[in-house]
From Swiss-Prot:
Keywords: Acetylation, Amino-acid transport, Membrane, Mitochondrion, One-carbon metabolism, Transmembrane, Transmembrane helix, Transport. Pfam families: SFXNs. The keyword Acetylation applies. The chain crosses the membrane at residues 146-164, 174-194, 226-246, 266-286. PANTHER family: SIDEROFLEXIN, SIDEROFLEXIN-3. GO terms for biological process: mitochondrial transmembrane transport; one-carbon metabolic process; serine import into mitochondrion. It comes from the Eukaryota. This is Sideroflexin-3. It is found in: Mitochondrion membrane. Mitochondrial serine transporter that mediates transport of serine into mitochondria, an important step of the one-carbon metabolism pathway. Mitochondrial serine is converted to glycine and formate, which then exits to the cytosol where it is used to generate the charged folates that serve as one-carbon donors. The modification N-acetylmethionine is found at residue 1. Belongs to the sideroflexin family.
Amino acid sequence: MGELPLDINIQEPRWDQRTFLGRARHFFTVTDPRNLLLSGAQLEASRNIVQNYRAGIVTPGLTEDQLWRAKYVYDSAFHPDTGEKVVLIGRMSAQVPMNMTITGCMLIFYRKTPTVVFWQWLNQSFNAVVNYSNRSGDAPITVRQLGMAYVSATTGAVATALGLKSLTKHLPPLVGRFVPFAAVAAANCINIPLMRQRELQVGIPVTNEQGQRLGHSVAAAKKGIFQVVISRICMAIPAMAIPPVIMDTLEKKDFLKRRPWLGAPLQMGLVGFCLVFATPLCCALFPQRSSIHVSRLEPELRAQIQEQNPSIEVVYYNKGL
């Protein structure tokens, strides 16, 4: 076997990101919870393999599959811009187990006001850690912006949950089970735009097909943020809509009536099962490198592009996660 060539592009995902299947395979790998079990030594070994390869040094005996594995392990634990190790619960691989626990508890403890407030607060605290850990190096989040988004999203989630909780008192019990989902959806609509408010003020970079930067666009930022909000809400739908329906049916059966202690672990398991698939599949709904027609850009930027590159009809931007 010959030495591994140096022309493998590990700056990009392994699979074609222009197709939904390629994006789904990428995010199934990125969100794999098993990466959380890797030791510090294994993470450092993967970092060394990746950094050496980028520097033109191939680890002896390294195969292409091992290189890609090291790349995804490295990406799962280290910030792409700063190179710092991301705190454990802020990693993409922590999304499924952390959301399983928090979402499961939101669905279990939805009846009493103190528990509703606590779990909505904890969910937004976790979101703040994830957003800060995965902040962009191109448009960094300040502590003030983080705090404003955190307080606003928590207030919005709690207000929505408590408001709907009072409205559903006289409705069938099943309706009350969907209150946590409505609160999470409302919080996403508040949290993500606030977290990315700088992008809404100054725009995000747009490029041509070759990746050459053409300017900054607020229109592209709005489209990217909208796509992320939709993805996040869709991500929550299976885990917060399917288990309540199943549990409402099962709780009327003798099996659970005789074994009420099974309700909580069963609901948690259903949430986890939904999230294992919903998280990567909903991350893959829109391409990470999305496109927008030049005609939808700001007049100044559109005129600048048409003057310098009249043949360009579509530009590209990173939508974020």
